[in-house]
Structure formats: C-alpha cells, structure tokens
Regions:
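Catalytic Tyr-X3-Lys helix of short-chain dehydrogenase/reductase
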Residues: 9, 57-62, 93-94
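NAD(P)-cofactor binding segment of oxidoreductase domains
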Residues: 1-17
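C-terminal substrate-binding subdomain of Rossmann-fold SDR/epimerase-dehydratase oxidoreductases
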Residues: 93-208
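Catalytic helix-loop patch of NAD(P)-dependent Rossmann-fold dehydrogenases
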Residues: 2, 16, 24-70, 81-82
Length: 208
C-alpha cells in the first residue's frame, strides 16, 4: 500500500486510490447492520492489517491531497473462488467430510462478485472529489450453518454436519448497512441461494 502511495504522490496528476478493505474491521461489537462511520474494533490479524492500511491511506490523503476510496467488502463469493466457506463446504460435502469449525451460528453478509463489480463501477463513475468509505455487501445476514445446508441440498447429501467450537478471532455477527451503496443507484441482484446454485454448477464442472 505504501509503495503505491509513494509512487502516486510523485505524479503530476494525482490519481484516485481505490482500496479493497474488509468489513472485518468492525469487529465483534455490533449485532445490527453496521454503518461506515461506526467505530472500528478489529480482532483478527487480517482485520488489523486492513485497519493499518486504511490509516496510512487517510494520512496520505490529509498530507498530500490524494483522493481515497475505501471499499469495505463483505464476504465476497462467486465462480472461480477456491477458498472460504462455500468452496470449503463443496469440498467437504462432496467428499463426505462433515467437520466444520465454529458453532454454525456465526452470521455473515454475502455478496456475489458480479454485484460487487457493478458497485465498484458505479462508485468509480461518480468521480467524487471527496474521500469515500463504502460498505460493499448485501445488507442481509446468513448463518454459517444455513449456507452449509444450502450446499448440502445442492449435492443431495444427507451427511450430518459436526461443528467443532474452538475459540476463533473472528466476529460472531457481521452485516453491512448498504444505504450509502444504494445511493449510487445500485442494488444487489443475486440472492445467496441463486449465487450458491451457480457456484456449485461451476464447482461440479471443474471437478467432472
């Protein structure tokens, strides 16, 4: 991040800097949909790293006049992604493995990558002169166990899921408030069930 910023301040025409941050910065303190101006309370090393990057970006903006756009991404998923919960669920359930970490009651906000791309385009097109911080999510929460059950149904699996409840440095509930995102005349089009269905079609195709 710092290398990009150091290069940017040397340019005659200062570029806008777009940074993909994370809603994990909000931490464990909230159970309602989280607004961009709420206090940041990161608990994981990943979130702390994102927080550090945001601080550097905003400092450079203050000192050098760079225009900064910070996008705080929810849980992004979609065809091609080979990590995170949905991919992990496909891998385990298709191979009759049933162990998942956590309680299953953790709540996350899922946004399909195509909806994210549409929002990023809208934000860039606005060409605001001011710095912006925008939540990028669906505004809806889904329990981990419900996501896994959707995957199970897609695989016609009757496997019984077992949760190993270990202490993890990750928030229990993360749901974004997307009022600001919607002000760009944007709204998510792909709901979680449709998104997972399309994802599993892709997953089965690459594993055929």
């Amino acid at each position: 991040t710092k290398s990009v910023l150091d290069f940017s301040i040397q340019l005659k025409e200062k570029p806008r800097i777009i940074f993909m941050s994370s809603y994990s910065l909000y931490g464990n303190s909230y159970t309602n949909s989280i607004k961009e101006n709420w206090a940041l309370k990161p608990v994981s090393s990943y979130a702390l790293t994102k927080k550090s990057s945001e601080d550097i970006l905003l400092k450079y903006s203050q000192v050098y006049g760079l225009k900064i756009i910070i996008l705080r991404l929810a849980s992004i998923y979609g065809e091609g992604l080979k990590k995170q919960l949905i991919f992990d669920s496909c891998e385990k359930i298709s191979n009759n493995r049933n162990i998942f970490y956590g309680t299953g009651n953790e709540i996350r906000d899922w946004l399909h990558v195509s909806d994210l791309c549409a929002l990023v385009y809208k934000v860039i097109k606005k060409n605001s002169k001011n710095n912006m911080i925008v939540n990028c999510g669906s505004g809806k929460g889904s329990k981990v166990k419900d996501i896994i059950e959707i995957v199970k149904k897609q695989f016609n699996s009757r496997i019984k899921i077992k949760y190993v409840n270990i202490k993890q440095k990750s928030p229990k509930v993360l749901i974004t408030n997307i009022k600001l995102a919607k002000s760009f005349k944007w709204a998510p089009k792909i709901n979680i069930k449709k998104g997972i269905s399309e994802y599993i079609k892709w997953y089965k195709k690459i594993n055929a």
